[in-house]
Amino acid sequence: YKNIITRSRDELDLKDSALVEELFKNNKIDIVVLAAAKVGGILANNTFRADFIFENLAIQNNIIHNSYKYGVEKLLFLGSSCIYPKQCLQPIKEEYLLNGELEYTNEPYAIAKIAGLKMCESYAIQYGCNFISVMPTNLYGINDNFDLYNSHVLPAMIRKMHLAKCLQENNMDSIKLNLGENYKSILKEFGISKDSVNI
């Protein structure tokens, strides 16, 4: 691909509908990969519930609608594996979506991601847009958040293992590495980037 347009969070607030529309109006955008989102670990999701649903809905609404309005040829929306029911069978299958109760701790985030998926589906049905969704597994990569309270499962595990290694007492029992019962696959960030280009 040539002429790739990217904006950091500091350069463009995707929650601001006027700024997002200006980006689309001033650039002929053919393909959009919507990977932007407010994300965090279980503690952040459960503590800042309103922020997670509001910010993610705003980002998705602005990008998806302007992609339609300005004739984007293809939009790829990256959802989240948390949209599937809390007690869903493993491995996860597409047909499990909306067939059970969501995990309470990240329910607002999951609902926002489900709304993004349904927006893409609805714009495809009503307007014939080539808007598709993929639900990647848990990701990690460069510049990930390794905070013990706000990160996702794998970065938190890496941080805990590092801390354990640094302990002079060599007491591994003091470090809890709990994946929980609903273990979900984990994929390095590069893998999803490479795979998404081929969808």
What name fits each language-model region?
Residues 17-57, 66-69:
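NAD(P)H-binding glycine-rich loop region in Rossmannoid oxidoreductase-like domains
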Residues 15, 81-84, 139-141:
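Conserved sequence/active-site signature of Rossmann-fold short-chain dehydrogenase/reductase
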Residues 61-106, 132:
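Conserved Rossmann-fold NAD(P)-dependent oxidoreductase catalytic core, especially the SDR/UDP-sugar
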Residues 87-96, 118-199:
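NAD(P)-dependent short-chain dehydrogenase/reductase
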Residues 2-22:
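Adenosine-cofactor binding site in Rossmann-like domains, unifying the SAM/SAH pocket
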Residues 7, 32-38, 75-81, 134-136:
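SDR active-site strand-loop-helix element
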Residues 108, 112:
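Active-site helix of classical SDR
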